[in-house]
C-alpha cells in the first residue's frame, strides 16, 4: 500500500533522513522505532506532505505522492495523528471530531472546493452546495439534498464508530478538549483522525506523556482498530515493547538511516534491539 524508496529529507541544511526505504502492506501494522532525533517523525511528515523529500519517491496505492500537497494526500485517505496531539484546545470534543471529518464530508466537486477556499463551515458548505445545485434546476437541487443526507448519515456512522472505540469521548462530547486528561486527549486525537475514514493511519508517538496503564489501553484500541477494520497503520513509537507487540513488521532508525528491518517477532528476539529498546 505504501512504499518509500531511498527517501532523503532535510530541514534546511540539516539532513534528517538518508535514503530511507520501507514498505507498509495493506491491512498491516508497521512500526518505526528509534531514539529521539532518529528521524521517525520526519518519516511521517514526508509521507503526509508536511515535508517534501529532496530525493527518492513515496507511493501510496501505486500513485506517487511525494510532490503532492498535504491536502491532496489527505484526500487520498491518509490520516496523520501528530506527535503532541495538536488538538483545538478551546473547542469541545464534538467540535474537534467534526473538524476531523472535514476532508471526507466537505464534498469533492468544484463548488465544494470553492466553499472550502471561502472558509465556510460544514453547514455553510452544505448551504453553498445547495444554492449552486439549485441554479441547475429542481433535479439538481433534489440530487444535492440526497447527497447532503447521505453525507450526514456517513458522518453519524463515523461518529458512532469513534464513540464505540472511545466511550469516554461520548460521555465528554460537550467538554472543552483542553480540560481532558492526557489519555483522553490522545483518544480524541486518534478519534479525530478516524473521522476522515482513512485507509492509512499515521500515528506519531501515541504513548508520549501517558501513564503505563493508559498507554496499554491506547495500544489495545489501536490493535482493535487494525483487527476490526483491517486499517493499515504506520506507527512511530519509542515504547518498543508495546509497538512490536501489535506490529507485523518493524524498522529501526538511527540518525536518519534504517539499520534493521524484520518481522516484529524477530526484532523482539534481536539482541541489539533488546539492549537498546527493550531494556534487556
Kindly label every feature range from the protein language model.
Residues 1-280:
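Glycine-rich phosphate-binding loops of nucleotide-dependent enzymes
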Amino acid at each position: 500500500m505504501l512504499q518509500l524508496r531511498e527517501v532523503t529529507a532535510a530541514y534546511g541544511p540539516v539532513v534528517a533522513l538518508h535514503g530511507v526505504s520501507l514498505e507498509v502492506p495493506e491491512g498491516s501494522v508497521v512500526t518505526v522505532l528509534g531514539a529521539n532525533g532518529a528521524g521517525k517523525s520526519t518519516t511521517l511528515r514526508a509521507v503526509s506532505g508536511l515535508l517534501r523529500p529532496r530525493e527518492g519517491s513515496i507511493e501510496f496505492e501505486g500513485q506517487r505522492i511525494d510532490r503532492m500537497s498535504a491536502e491532496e494526500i489527505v484526500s487520498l485517505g491518509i490520516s496523520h495523528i501528530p506527535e503532541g496531539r495538536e488538538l483545538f484546545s478551546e473547542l469541545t470534543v464534538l467540535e474537534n471530531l467534526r473538524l476531523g471529518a472535514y476532508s471526507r464530508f466537505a464534498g469533492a466537486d468544484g463548488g465544494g472546493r470553492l466553499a472550502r477556499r471561502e472558509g465556510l463551515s460544514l453547514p455553510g458548505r452544505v448551504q453553498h452546495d445547495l444554492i449552486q445545485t439549485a441554479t441547475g434546476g429542481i433535479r439538481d437541487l433534489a440530487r444535492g439534498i440526497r447527497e447532503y443526507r447521505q453525507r450526514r448519515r456517513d458522518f453519524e456512522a463515523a461518529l458512532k464508530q469513534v464513540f464505540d472505540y472511545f466511550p469516554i469521548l461520548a460521555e465528554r462530547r460537550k467538554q472543552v478538549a483542553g480540560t481532558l486528561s492526557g489519555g483522553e486527549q490522545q483518544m480524541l486525537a486518534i478519534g479525530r483522525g478516524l473521522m476522515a475514514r482513512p485507509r492509512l493511519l499515521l500515528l506519531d508517538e501515541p504513548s508520549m506523556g501517558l501513564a503505563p496503564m493508559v498507554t496499554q489501553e491506547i495500544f489495545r484500541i489501536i490493535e482493535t482498530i487494525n483487527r476490526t477494520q483491517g486499517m493499515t497503520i504506520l506507527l512511530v513509537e519509542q515504547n518498543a515493547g508495546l509497538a512490536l507487540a501489535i506490529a507485523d513488521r518493524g524498522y529501526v532508525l538511527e540518525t536518519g538511516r534504517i539499520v534493521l528491518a524484520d518481522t516484529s517477532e524477530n526484532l523482539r528476539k534481536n539482541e541489539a534491539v533488546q539492549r537498546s529498546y527493550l531494556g534487556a
